[in-house]
Structure formats: C-alpha cells, structure tokens
Swiss-Prot record:
It comes from Oryctolagus cuniculus (Rabbit). Residues 1-16 are annotated as: Required for protein stability. It comes from the Eukaryota. GO terms for biological process: D-alanine catabolic process; D-serine catabolic process; digestion; dopamine biosynthetic process; L-leucine metabolic process; neutrophil-mediated killing of gram-negative bacterium; proline catabolic process. The gene is DAO. This is D-amino-acid oxidase. Pfam families: DAO (PF01266).
Length: 347
C-alpha cells in the first residue's frame, strides 16, 4: 500500500510514525513517503514554546480534550526513559495568573499537582489576584522533530522536500491514502473557509535563572495576547502576540516592543536576558480541528484522504492523540479495502 503524508511539522511526522508503528506489520510492504516544502529547523514547531497546556475554555469538540490527555500521558510515559533527552522532553512547573477568579480548567486532573495559588504566592505577582500552580511537560520542538525524523527514516519512510500544489498531483501516482497535515496552508489544497492564520511573534531568550513558566490571562484581550515566559530545554520563550488573518512573515517592531514591555515587570526577571532570536509563525486557527476522511476521485480511481489540521497554537499539546485518531481512520480504510476484495458468499 502506498501512503503519502503531506506536512512535516509535529502533526505530520507524529501521524506518519503512529500509522507506521501500528500497521507496518499488517501491510507488507507499507510504502510511506512524506512531502513538505519545509522541514526542521524551518517549521512552526521548531520555534514553539513547547509547553503542554490546552486552552483554558473547553473545546467545542469534546474529543479534543481526550486527544490532549492522550498526548500528555504518552509523553509522560517517556519522561524517565533514555529517549527523553533526545526528544527534548522534561517536566516543568509554573504559574497561570488572572486578575479575577475563574473556573478550574478541564485538564486540571491531567497535569501534576494542580492547585490554586496562596495569598503569599500572589504577592509575588502584583496586579494579579488569582492563579494556579501545576507541573506539566515541556517539549523542545526542534529536538522532537529530529527524534521523530530519525525514527521514521529507520523504518524506511522516505522524506522529500516538495511543495504539493494539489491532491491530484499526488493521487495521480497510484497513491492509496493521502494524509493531509498541512496546517495553516491546508486551504491551498482544498478551500476551507473555517481555517485562518493566527500570526504569532515570539522572542527566544537566554535566561537560565527563570525556572518556572509564567502565563498571564486577560479574557478581554483573548488567547495568546497576554504576556508569558516559558523556560525551555535550551532557551526561554517570551510572547503574547496573536493576530488573526494576518499573513506577513517578517518580524514586526511593534510586536517586539509589546513582548518586551509586557514581560518587563520585576517578577518576569527578563530585563538582562540575552536575546537569542526572534521568530514569526502562523497558528492554524479553526473552530474545531479537522480530523476526518473523504474520498477524492483521481481519474477512474478513488483516493482516500485523511485530514488532520487546524490545531491552533497547541499542536505539541494534542499531536499524539490526533495521530492515534488518524491511525484509527487509516485502520478503517484498510478494513473496507479488505472487505471489498473478499469474494461474495454463496450461502
């Protein structure tokens, strides 16, 4: 069976690996190819802050909460393994801060040691009157993509740098299944009015003295628009920019100033941090993740397409659960193909 995965960010590579791990023994051979116009270190995943934390509000699709939980448990199972260092995986603790009381998040029992902040702790953060503390996971995107790539190539999966302009150009080569993990660019392959780019700009800093993540929340501003700093495995990430429908890739000076000013208070402790770099990326924003299948006609034959995109700014948080779901869809395709080849019963 021939399978093509389009996209080489965390969604594309993890989905490819999950499908290959679950079905390579049942399909001999399983010929899998990954096409992408950008590979690590040039993907959005490479510069993501990497903290496992879903949105505070419940997702409109309840399955998304399950996919995030599955991802946390999958990563946590690796935390004491020899692979953790190569994956760029570590435990991290920190604070979510608010100006007024808010309901507990649905993921409070997924993370470790979730609790409300004490008054003494809140004294460390002037201007904030409510908050949480918990231990979560941090995943360095670049290290993780390299780890996934190595596992895929060891399995014989082929990776090619190629910009796919349409499903037809891939399906025409005798491909049985296409897995669409193109993120914010999915509309170029098939129009999707629900998909929008959510432009973000972050600053990477060398601040080894910052040991805990600090994420502030302002419901009036919306998600991603409040200051945050997230220590990483190698460098910290300073941010707080989100512009929906904005495509320019260059760094904007006003956004740089916004990030720096927002994280300039005494509790941020980033004033003297050395700036390592600054990046702009696009979150594939959609009301719900598109994770489903459809059939496309390519001449006389039909090609199955599994869509897996629209993860917003939390692809690393939800990737493995989505990969498992995509693999289930792949399994259903196999069952249907097997049934269609069975001779009819004469009973």
């Amino acid at each position: 069976m021939r399978v093509v995965v389009i996209g080489a960010g965390v969604i594309g590579l993890s989905t490819a690996l999950c499908i290959h791990e679950l079905y390579h023994s049942a399909l001999q051979p399983l010929d899998m190819t990954i096409y992408a116009d950008r590979f690590t270190p040039l993907t959005n995943t490479d510069v993501a802050a990497g903290l496992w934390q879903p949105y505070l509000s419940d997702p409109s699709n309840p399955q998304e909460a399950d996919w995030s939980r599955q991802t946390f448990n999958h990563l946590l199972s690796h935390i004491h393994s020899p692979s953790a260092e190569k994956m760029g995986l570590a435990l991290i603790s920190g604070y979510n801060l608010f100006r007024k009381a808010v309901p507990d998040p649905s993921w409070k029992d997924t993370v470790l040691g979730f609790r409300k902040l004490t008054l003494r702790e809140l004294d460390m953060f002037p201007g904030y009157s409510y908050g949480w503390f918990n231990t979560s996971l941090i995943l360095d995107g670049r290290s993780y993509l390299q780890w996934l790539t190595k596992r895929l190539t060891e399995r014989g999966v082929k990776l090619f740098q190629r910009k796919v302009e349409s499903f037809d150009e891939v399906a025409g080569g005798g491909v049985d299944v296409i897995v669409n993990c193109t993120g914010v660019w999915a509309s170029a392959l098939q129009p999707d009015p629900l998909l929008q780019p959510g432009r973000g700009q972050i600053i990477k800093v060398d601040a080894p003295w910052v040991k805990h993540f600090i994420i502030t929340h302002d419901p009036e501003s919306g998600i991603y628009k409040s200051p945050y700093i997230i220590p990483g495995v190698f460098n910290g990430t300073v941010g707080g920019i989100f512009k929906r429908g904005d495509y320019p890739e260059g760094n904007a000076s006003e956004n740089h100033s916004c990030c720096q000013t927002g994280c300039s208070g005494p509790h941020w402790r980033t004033k003297d941090a050395r700036i390592v770099g600054e990046w702009t990326g696009f979150r594939p924003v959609r009301p719900q993740i598109r994770l489903g299948r459809e059939q496309l006609s390519a001449g006389p034959s039909k090609t199955e397409v599994i869509h897996n995109y629209g993860h917003g700014g939390y692809g690393l948080t939800i990737h493995w659960g989505c990969a498992l779901e995509a693999a289930k869809l792949f399994g259903k395709i196999l069952e249907e193909k097997k049934s269609s080849r069975m001779p009819p019963s004469h009973l």
